[in-house]
């Protein structure tokens, strides 16, 4: 599923991401835009053999199990396929664990490069939330 900007903001808010660990909703919407272009089915292979999955491009080396990543930790205790669902609950729950891990949203390279330090409120502007 490819979410609309405001549709995704509403879903993320409903699932408790707004101001989770101090990150406003705009940060999460911005991260999803530049990680997956709001597409829940996005997958990208990395040079180390791991793969990033779903709307927030969650990595199989640390966070989920795809059965093909050597030394996978699966810290969210989920199959990576769960992160490709049109229902973003699994992705959001895992993202909460990731953002609580010490580096905050810096864990997402696209957030660090494209969202951090910008006016992220623009991502939720005009949305009925």
Curated annotation (Swiss-Prot):
Q: Which UniProt keywords apply?
A: Antimicrobial, Bacteriolytic enzyme, Disulfide bond, Glycosidase, Hydrolase, Secreted
**Does the entry feature the keyword Secreted, yes or no?**
yes
Give the residues annotated as active site. Answer: 35, 52
Is-annotated flag, keyword Nucleotide-binding?
no
The UniProt record lists the EC number as: 3.2.1.17
Domain named C-type lysozyme is located at: 1-129
Name the top EC class: hydrolase
What reaction(s) does this enzyme catalyze?
Hydrolysis of (1->4)-beta-linkages between N-acetylmuramic acid and N-acetyl-D-glucosamine residues in a peptidoglycan and between N-acetyl-D-glucosamine residues in chitodextrins
**Where found, per UniProt?**
Secreted
| Disulfide bond entries | 6-127, 30-115, 64-80, 76-94
Miscellaneous field: Lysozyme C is capable of both hydrolysis and transglycosylation; it also shows a slight esterase activity. It acts rapidly on both peptide-substituted and unsubstituted peptidoglycan, and slowly on chitin oligosaccharides.
Family to which this protein belongs? Belongs to the glycosyl hydrolase 22 family.
Its recorded name reads: Lysozyme C
Q: What gene is this protein translated from?
A: LYZ
